Structures are given as structure tokens and as C-alpha cells.
Amino acid sequence: MRDYLEIIRRNLMSPIVIAIFLLALALLYAGERRDAWFISVVIAVNTVIGIVQEVRAKHALKQLELMSAPRARLVRGDEVVEVMYDALQVGDEILLEAGDELPADGVVLSARGLEVNESMLTGESASIDKKKHDEVYAATTVIAGSARVRVTAVGDATKAGAISATLKQYMPRLTPLQQAIQNAITFLTYCAIVLSLLVFARYRIAGFESVRILKTIITSAITIVPEGLLLASSLLLAFGSLKLAQAKVLPQKLSAIEAMALLNILCTDKTGTLTSDEITLERVEPFGSGNEPVKQLAAMVAHETSGGNATGQAIITALDLPYEYTVDDILAFSSARKFAGVRARVDGRVRTLIMGAPEYVARMAPLSTAEQQQIEKWTDDGLRVLLLAEFDDNNTPLKSLKSGSGRPLAVILLRNLLRDGVVDTVAFLQRQGVNIRVISGDNPRTVQYVARAAGINNPDTAITGAELAELDEPAFATAADQHTIFARVLPEQKEHLIAHFSQQNHQFTGMVGDGVNDALALKKADLGVAMYAGAPASRRVADIILLNNSFNSLPLGMRLGNQIMQAIEVIATLFFHKIIYGLVLLAVTLVLGVIHPYAPRHITFLNIFLVTMPTIMWTLFPPRSHHRINPHNFWRDTLGAVTPIALVSGVAVSITYLMLRAMQPHDQDTVSTMTVLVATFFGIYLVFLAGPMLGVVLDRRAKTARMLYIAAALLVASTSFAVPLLRRFFDFTIPTLAMIGPVAGVVVIAALLQWHLARRAGKTYQNR
């Protein structure tokens, strides 16, 4: 409820709303009731509509957010049920696995190789072992092992409660584009104040009465300040988020849509992203005599340490466990170590076993040259290779086994096929100018094989995490820029790489991942993309969640995001057209010292056709673009395209006004009526110019919407003239043919010139 009250307060207390209401009170005090009541009602209606739309969008996004919100596994008797974090109570018992974010503070009842990252609380990224009776804290992450925990504190009562309380407050953050629009509104507001002073001084010198000066000041302010542009962009981003969610791409932040439009580097994991979730065991190749039960030993290590990950499940599914064994100690798998271990009594014999990446396990259990060459051959074929080793030392903790003290028993070969459609997805991204980098914890040869099969450019440029670790910062930066494949990379190295790419000028970096080892990198990226089935910790920090767990959803998401950004550009041109032509008309009247043709209610009437109705149309039916939109070029693309057209509108409206004023010097109502009609025509005409001007493509629905807009505009305009009450309210008169003839010539010439300018702007736009 607090979130919605904040929305209401923010909309009602907007400086623009307050200023317009104060000006309306001034008009009321001056006896101009029609203008006072009309602009008050209009701004009130617009504010209510804005509140309703924002509340609806907030509610819808909150419902979607609940879809991706992580759940806690609550133990109830003999059952385990998934519940929302806020449903937990002190005394509840929950189960934790690798990748989980702790939902509450608690005490460990039992643990199997539990390691926790407490960097969210302490800033230290090193993992911490947790045993029975140890305390664990909310907002920390399980990076290895599993545990059963009794909840001791929830919500604001946890150690991270102060942080959580801050996060609960509804503090909408503007996207970079929205911030630019907000800055423009602030700047134009100051301009309106300066212009108001100029209007007051010039018209006071010219001898105009105070009421007329006040009306002109209000008219100028309403014309210049694009008060609805920020709201329009917010609603477009919100409704765009809903459309993306329907396409199985869930933005957790409004800025994600803009980020997709800016993306030019995409770092992706291999397993579960480029390749499918399904990993299959090809075979087990024993070393030595082959008398050891290596398949059963590998199955035992996977069963006790994998924490349910896909690699472990593939081994467990394909191989049988030993008939009987008792575990003495385990070392759960973690991405930082690249291996796992078990010490167990099997058939009466103590076995100390390590299984993991050959490069890491071989440091403790050396391989012969022939064995290393054979492993390289398997990785060249795209197989994922694990090395199983045994140690005679049955007393030293598994973490502290001596280098070189073990012997290799076997290699486990697994196959992980490309996801369907990955080749097309990679091709689409690269056509859009996105540079794809693969950052993986796997063997470099295996990663290169997958990258080559996926069609990623420059797959032969590879470097390992061990090589990166030996480089100083300048050399690291050079290596990062020169390589496409980063293999056997540690989680903190992933974060370092993402930070480097993001710091480059005009580089906007995305990261796609699903594991707990990806969480740091996802958080550091400009655009973090997580899989719905991935670790809760990665989902928590991501900007976008792929609800169908498919990397192939990104192109559709980028297309929809591009549509939304294009719609914002089109709507912005409507506002800028209104502002620029209004400034031209105001400048002409100030220089010549003549009365301004509009009353405040005329500006509101014009805004219906120039801004409100087209904005609704483009919001409901966003256009498609021939090219990829870049929000960095927002001002150049919008102002650069519409300024010449708006100047023509301003000159044409000014000529019309001065010409009619000369023809009918004593009939201000008729002159104002014709001036309003001409300005309305140019506003409606701009909707047709948007296509050639910005390279917009209208599908059948958008073309139908445009025709409905024309029909609605004609209906509203004709009603305003046909109904005597409305006609009198706006001080409109029925134009005569004698006045329409000269005006038509000016309008036709201006319209032809604008069409030429729009076509030229479109060609320039598309050639950038």
C-alpha cells in the first residue's frame, strides 16, 4: 500500500502540476473563470489518468515479479513445500542447496559441505565453511553443499534488515533516457520562467492589460514544458515490460528495456546457455589395470557433492552407487575450486576421492603426457571431461590434500549439445553489432568447440583463468579485449572481466548466466540476464529473467525493446514539434509586439490532437523500426529530425496568424480559430510524417490505429465546432471561404516542404 501512496503523492506534488494550479488560481482571481476551470480540470484528469496507469503498471509488474521471486524450501513434517520468503516465521526449518540465497537468519541443524558467501554483509568474497550450530544470515548465498537450518529472525529483524527495509521502499529509478528527459523538462521549466519574464516586460511596455499578459504567460508555460513526456516514457516502458513478459522475457527493472537497445557486448556462459540443460554421460575411461570400481566411485562422489547440478545428475542417472558405503567427510563442488571430494568407507576400505576439472585435479594427481594428450583430444571433440583421483592420505582434510600426492583413477566423459536455435540467435545478435564473448568454467578446448559450432566470431582466441591471474591490470585489459573465449574462469574473474568491458567508452555489457558462480558478474553487468531455472541468487540480481530458460528468447526481447524505444522516440518528436513551433510563434508575437493568438484553453485543445491522442496510439500500437535504436543518440535522432519540420510549422502558423490579423484586425476570435485549426493540421500531419522521418514501419494494426486516430480527431474537432456550447467555450467561430483560401495556400506549401524534409531526415537516419 505504501508503494501506491508514494505514486499518488509523487504525481500530485509534481512541480508542473502545482505551478499550473497556481496559475489557474491567478486566472480565477482575475475573473477568467473559463480558462481557470478548464486547465484545472484538464490537469486534474491527466494527473488521475497518470496515477491510474502507473498503479496498474506497478501492480502488473509486481504480479510478474512474484513469478520469478525465489522461494524457500520449508520442512513441514515429512513434506517439503516452497513458500515465499515473507511467509517464513521464527522456528521454521528450511533446506538449503548450492545457489540458494538465505531468506532469513538461522542456525545450522545439519550440514553437508556447506560453504556460504557473506560478501553482501561483510564485503569479503571468500567462502566460509558452516558446520552444525553455526549461524547463517539472510542475504548471503550458498555456494557449495547443503544444510538444514532453523529460522531465528525474519524480515527487518535479520542482520540485513536495515538493507531490506530500504529495498522495500518504492523508489522508482529513472533509466538513462528518462533521466535525460527529466533534465530536459527541468531546463525547459527554467526557460519557461525566463520567457514569462520576457512576456511580462514586452507586453507591459506594449500596454497590454494584466489579464492578457497573464493568459499569454500561462499559454507559453503550457506550450514549452513537455510535462507528459516523462509519464509517457514511463508508461511505455512499463507496458513494454508486460509485453516482454508475455514473450517469456521478464524485465525486473524498467531500465532493462533501454539496456537491450544499448547492448553491444554480450558475455555468456556455456553450459545451460549455449548448450542445453541436458548433460549425458558418454562413457567412463579408467586408467591403469581397470580393476577399480571407478564407475561406482564416480557415482558416489557425484551423489554426495553435486548438490543437484546437471553434471552430477547426469553421472548419478547413468551409473550405479556402491552397494554399501559410509561417508566420513565431503567437500562440496564449488566454481572457485573446480572440484569436489569425498572420504568414505566403501566395502570396508577408506577411500579418499577427488573429482573435477582435469587442470585442477591433476595438480594433486599428476597425469602422464599420454594421458594429458588423450584428454586434449576428447575436449577437442567437444566432450566435457572430469578427472577422478584417489589419495592414500585418509586423515588430512579434503581441502588440504598435498599437491602431487594422488593418482588418477579415471576420466568421466560427458556430452552437452547445443540448444536448438542457438546458431540463429548468435547470428541475429552479431548482425545487430553485438560482440559475443564466452566466459566459462569449462575446458578451453571444449568451450572453443561449442563456440565454433554456435557460429560465434573468432572462437580460436582463447585464454584461461590461470593465465589471466598472472597478468597485471594493463595486461589484463589487453587480454580481455583481444580474446573471445575465457575458459576455466573463476567467479571473481568473471566479475573482473564484466567490469572491464563495462568501463570502456560507449560499451554496454550484458551477461547471461544461470549458476551461483554467475551472480557476481550478473550484478556487475549493465544488463544481467538469468535463467528462470537457474540459481535463486542469480535470479535475484538479474535485470532480466528468461522464463522459458532459453537463450533464444533474447532476439524477441530485443525486437520488442527496440519497438518500445522507437515509440518513445516518435512520441518525443510530437512534444518537441509542439515546443519548437510554439516558441517560433511566441518569438514572432514578442518581436512584433502583437497579441498572442491563443488562450490557455486553446493550448489544451491543441494538446489533445498534437500529443494526447497520438501518444495513446503509439503506446498501444508501437511501431517497428528498420534498424536498431540507440538511446545514446536520442537527442540527435529526435531533435535532428523534427526541428526543421517544426520550424516550418512555426513559420506557417505565424504567417497564417499575421495574414489573418491583417485581414480581420477587429475579429480576434476568428483569427484565433483559424490559427488553432492550422496548428492542429500540422500536428495531425506529423503523425503521417513519423514513418518517413524516423524509418518507422507500420504493421496492419498500427495502420488501422492511425486511421482510428484520424477519425477520432475529426470527430472531436467537428464536435467542438458543431455543438454551440463547446464552440462558445473555446471562442471558436465558423471560418469563411474567404479566409480559408489564402490560408490553404500557406498550408499546402508548408506541408510539401515538410514531406521533403521528413524524407531527407529518414535517409540520414537510416544511413547512420
Task: Annotate each predicted stretch with a short phrase.
Residues 262-408, 414, 427-428, 436-452, ...:
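Cytosolic catalytic regions of ATP/NTP-dependent phosphoryl-transfer enzymes
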Residues 32-42, 180, 206-219, 229-231, ...:
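Membrane-water interface of transmembrane alpha-helices in multipass transporters/channels
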Residues 49, 79, 152-155, 168, ...:
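Conserved beta-strand/loop elements of the cytosolic catalytic core of P-type E1-E2 ATPases, chiefly
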Residues 41, 69-182, 384-387, 470-480, ...:
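Cytosolic catalytic regions of P-type ion-transporting ATPases
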Residues 199, 229, 237, 458-510, ...:
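Membrane-embedded transport module
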Residues 1-72, 156, 167-246, 430, ...:
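Hydrophobic alpha-helical segments characteristic of transmembrane helices
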Residues 66, 70-75, 229-297, 303, ...:
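Conserved catalytic phosphorylation-site environment of P-type ATPases
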